[in-house]
């Protein structure tokens, strides 16, 4: 029988009213959402991981979806380091001392910031597709109006899912939340996230790191991830899908998280 899912909210000292979910028991695994900020994307793999002997925690990110009640500074001028500090605070309040941490995109930047800045809290890090530079179509996205951002980012995100049927199946409530999240992301993330990536040698060897990129994505988009991981002799492999493997291929994603985490227990 699948473990029960806890869904609740918690207010941390930085003023963020977090929506969070937990499932399972055992060593802690924290799944950090990508820049779109909605943890519903982890719904299917979370149960698989929780049924495999782990306690899984995830949450909507500050200012996003059901964590929208948050001070503006928590979702403006966002960096991996800023998000890492917020996540340590919520880990403290939830009693999570050490965890294996996964994150994609800005979530991956957050994973690297946790590994570098809070190695005592991280068993192992699993970054997926860390943004190190903005593609041309994001250079001036912060100048666009909210309606244009929501329309364009909905199309881009669907394409980057590499499984449009699974993306659509997230459901109308999730996509309604994402429409607002696209705007907060565009105004708060692209100008500051890429430059915050903790990719120096001194950042990358404090805890074990296993890096991934999407097998279905254009190689050039995240090729710098391959360059950095190779330079630092960090294991790097592909996962099925592109930018959201937990949506497009939930079983394969869960298997990767479980098998990778077990290496470090």
Curated annotation (Swiss-Prot):
Its EC number is 3.1.1.-. It is an enzyme of class 3 (hydrolase). Belongs to the AB hydrolase superfamily. Hydrolase RutD family. InterPro entries: AB_hydrolase, AB_hydrolase_1, AB_hydrolase_fold. Optimum pH is 8.0. Zearalenone binds at residues 35, 105-106, 185, 189, 243. It holds the Pfam family Abhydrolase_1. Keywords: Detoxification, Hydrolase. The keyword Cell cycle does not apply. It catalyses: zearalenone + H2O = hydrolyzed zearalenone + H(+). Optimum temperature is 35 degrees Celsius. Lactonohydrolase that specifically hydrolyzes zearalenone (ZEN), an oestrogenic mycotoxin produced by numerous Fusarium specie, into a non-toxic alkylresorcinol product. The keyword Hydrolase applies. Homodimer. This is Zearalenone hydrolase. The active site is at 105, 129, 243. GO terms for molecular function: hydrolase activity. GO terms for biological process: response to toxic substance.
